[in-house]
Amino acid sequence: MPLDFVLLHYINVVNRDYIKDLSERAMKDIDEGNLDSAITKSTTILEETFCYAIEIKGEEPSDNGDIGKLYKQVKDLYSMHANKDMDKRVNKLLSGLENIVQSIAEMRNNGSDSHGLGSKRVNIADYHARLAVNSSTTMAEFILSVSQNSK
C-alpha cells in the first residue's frame, strides 16, 4: 500500500484548525479558572502535533506521553538542529523551543490535572497558564509548518 494512502486513511489530521480549536478550549478553561486543565491541553497540543509530524514521515512516535522524547524525534526527522551555517538568531530561536517543551512538560507533571499530587501541586497564575497555552500553540504551528514544507 502506498504511504500516501496509509497516511490519508489512518492518521487523524492535525492542522491549524485543530490546534486553534484546542487552544481556544484551553483559553476557555483559563477564563473559567480551570488552570490545570489548560496546562494539560497545552501539553496535548504539542504531543498531538509531534506525533502527527512523526507519523507523516512514516515513523512511529517513540514514546507517546513524553513530549521531550517526541520533540527529539521530530528534530531528528526534520533536521531541526542548530547549524553553524544557519543564521545565529534562528539557532537561538530553535534552542528556545527546547525550553518551551521542557517547561510545559514540567508544568503538566507538577501543575495540571493529569496526575494526582496532593499538596505537591504547583499553583500557577492565570497569566502563566496563558503563557503555556500560547507557547505550545506557537510551537505547534511552527512544527506543523516545518512538516508541511518537507513533504
Name the predicted role of every residue range.
Residues 58-97:
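Short, charged amphipathic alpha-helical segments flanked by flexible coils
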Residues 46-57, 78-82, 115, 147:
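Alpha-helix capping/termination and helix-coil
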Residues 26-33, 56, 115-119, 147:
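Secondary-structure edge/capping motif, primarily at the C-terminal ends of alpha-helices
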Residues 1-32, 37:
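Internal, Lys/Arg-enriched amphipathic helical interaction segments that engage polyanionic partners
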Residues 23-27, 34-55, 133-137, 141:
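Short, hydrophobic, well-ordered secondary-structure elements
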Residues 20-28, 84-89, 117:
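Short, charged/polar, low-complexity loop and linker segments
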Residues 1-2, 10, 55, 123, ...:
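Terminal alpha-helical segments
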Residues 93-151:
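Charge-enriched, short contiguous segments at helix-coil
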